[in-house]
Amino acid sequence: MTNKKVVVLVAGGTGGHLFPAEALAVELRQRGYDVHLATDERAKRFVRHFDEKHIHIISSATLVRHHPFALIKTFWLLLRGMVQSWILFRKLRPVLVGGFGGYPTVPPVWVAALTGRVTFIHEQNAVMGRANRVLATRVNAIASGLLLENKIHIHKTFVTGNPVREAILKAAEIPYCASTSKQPFYFLVFGGSQGASAFSRIVPEAVKLLDHDIRERLHIVQQVRGEEIDLAKIYQDMGVQAEVAPFFDNMVEHIARSHFIMSRAGASTVCEIAIIGRPALLIPYPHALDHDQAANAALLAARGGAQIMLEKDLNAQILSSLLTKFCCEPHSLEQRALAAKKVGKPQATRVLADMAEALIVGRSLLDMKREFFDENTT
């Protein structure tokens, strides 16, 4: 039986929710804590830093309105998850419970708060997600990745940033170097399953409109869906160097090497681009819940580190004009790269762990603001 203090982190079973939880877990273990993960079945595909005995599956479900039978099932699963959470906490006796978004966080964090345990939530996006909104009034602190100031919760909201991979921090040491008129211009295009199809249609049309001398310089790295892999042949026929694939193991290297990026605006993407310091054209996913990607993009654009364009407004002519401009005026991209880097928060994992330890020892919220988060004080 370990004598270490136990911390339970709770996250929905997708990479976006799990990664910051895992990053914090690694840091807290180095500080001597025994860290457990409460999540749902989906997490098994993504978890890297928890062994089986430290993973606890909790029942939950996404709230579905206007469907009575689905609503009944959802409430039953939430109730079951609350009972499971209560039993788990009785066994582990955690000194801290932290939620990282997604509906699976609701039962454990709710029960933890209800039973008087110290709690926090971490919001990755500039707009608070639905599960975190349910929990915001009940927790002791709200850690902000990109979250815009919310006057209702300002007294307990702390800007920590979003934890990123160690590879991102290493890539951040590589300075941005503008592409001169005789050098290749690296253009990175990615958007996951939510962006690949739209980008695969627009980018080659834009490339066709470029002058020959610019096409000769262009080196495209583009994420596509599996059925769109023949895009490589289209670029080849236009005389453009291109790497096309559904997934890149070395995506961090591609971000660091790029002169210009076109991507969606998920929280992790925006944070990684900012920390490495690369200029971007951000196209928010139009069907994102609560328009969180638009808010994420707006935060970086407001500091001059990115340009936003709605998908409905993007066409081949506009993209072609942008590529021509940036190939001919590389120093404007240098300025955007510097602006993006100023937004990045490479110390996010450490700051989040500092906040967690402050909560554990009972530090007041005001003291925590003064010491760690002066930039969030109004």
Curated annotation (Swiss-Prot):
Gene3D superfamilies in UniProt: Glycogen Phosphorylase B (3.40.50.2000)
Biological-process GO terms, alphabetical: carbohydrate metabolic process; cell division; cell wall organization; lipid glycosylation; peptidoglycan biosynthetic process; regulation of cell shape
Source organism superkingdom: Bacteria
Subcellular localization(s) per the UniProt record: Cell inner membrane
GO molecular function, one term: UDP-N-acetyl-D-glucosamine:N-acetylmuramoyl-L-alanyl-D-glutamyl-meso-2,6-diaminopimelyl-D-alanyl-D-alanine-diphosphoundecaprenol 4-beta-N-acetylglucosaminlytransferase activity
EC number: 2.4.1.227
Pfam family, one: Glyco_transf_28
Reactions performed catalytically: di-trans,octa-cis-undecaprenyl diphospho-N-acetyl-alpha-D-muramoyl-L-alanyl-D-glutamyl-meso-2,6-diaminopimeloyl-D-alanyl-D-alanine + UDP-N-acetyl-alpha-D-glucosamine = di-trans,octa-cis-undecaprenyl diphospho-[N-acetyl-alpha-D-glucosaminyl-(1->4)]-N-acetyl-alpha-D-muramoyl-L-alanyl-D-glutamyl-meso-2,6-diaminopimeloyl-D-alanyl-D-alanine + UDP + H(+)
Its biological purpose: Cell wall formation. Catalyzes the transfer of a GlcNAc subunit on undecaprenyl-pyrophosphoryl-MurNAc-pentapeptide (lipid intermediate I) to form undecaprenyl-pyrophosphoryl-MurNAc-(pentapeptide)GlcNAc (lipid intermediate II).
Identification of the protein by name: UDP-N-acetylglucosamine--N-acetylmuramyl-(pentapeptide) pyrophosphoryl-undecaprenol N-acetylglucosamine transferase
